[in-house]
């Protein structure tokens, strides 16, 4: 029996519920015994009373991608999809992720950390800047700062979601993402949005966002991006499945943005799109993720 653990209490709850329902439908259609559990508020104690052998974690954001639920399952000896608690913890914290990636000589935008309780260190890289909470996904709480006067409002927004914010040099360029399944990188997807960046609205509600797969990179460029994505994925000790996001600037230099250890699985989601490009159906994708346990 597979428990599909969805919902959660993060800002990405609504997306998790959509993802969980899609996974339930595909497993149910294949006559695989499964059920969904909507974690909401403090009802997790009810989950542990259910009978199941494995857990498909489709919780996005805090609680689901930060190692909390993974640690709970590990302590109970229960198998689950995706990365373990340590890798999840490291990947959820954007600042921690950057430190690990820098240790592996991966290319990142210059940045500093801004603590809500401390004065901000001098920013020694040029405007514009991206200001983002260290502990949220789906581009929640992110602002583009074009001048110094906008910085305070951007920090106040980011600090609503986490006590630390990342101030990062804004890299102008095209956004790409690489899905990982097992030890393989799937085809690269290019993201084109009419917004300043690929924000929450662009990801989940806009019909103007375009996704290109094939991504219009040369074969050499695509293979290079896939190789960087795999290096970034394994540097965090991630496993099973995930997604690594990039920006490629006007000089064709790729910069890592972030890693997602529990990406979305909705109709707008990019992992199913990349899988479909090489003939992997949604049914096959879901069962492949389970087989990676």
Curated annotation (Swiss-Prot):
Any Pfam family the entry gives? Dala_Dala_lig_C
What is this enzyme's EC?
A: 6.3.2.4
A GO molecular function annotation here is: ATP binding
Q: Metal-binding: present as a keyword of the record? A: yes
Q: In which pathway does it act?
A: Cell wall biogenesis; peptidoglycan biosynthesis
Q: Which PROSITE patterns match?
A: ATP_GRASP, DALA_DALA_LIGASE_2
The positions annotated for binding Mg(2+) 2 are: 258, 260
On cofactor binding, the record's note says: Binds 2 magnesium or manganese ions per subunit.
Q: Which intervals hold domain ATP-grasp?
A: 98-291
Give the record's GO CC terms.
cytosol
- Write out the annotated subcellular location: Cytoplasm
Q: What does this protein do?
A: Cell wall formation.
Family stated for the protein in its record: Belongs to the D-alanine--D-alanine ligase family.
Which HAMAP family does the entry mention? Dala_Dala_lig
For this entry, the protein name equals: D-alanine--D-alanine ligase
Q: Which gene encodes it?
A: ddl
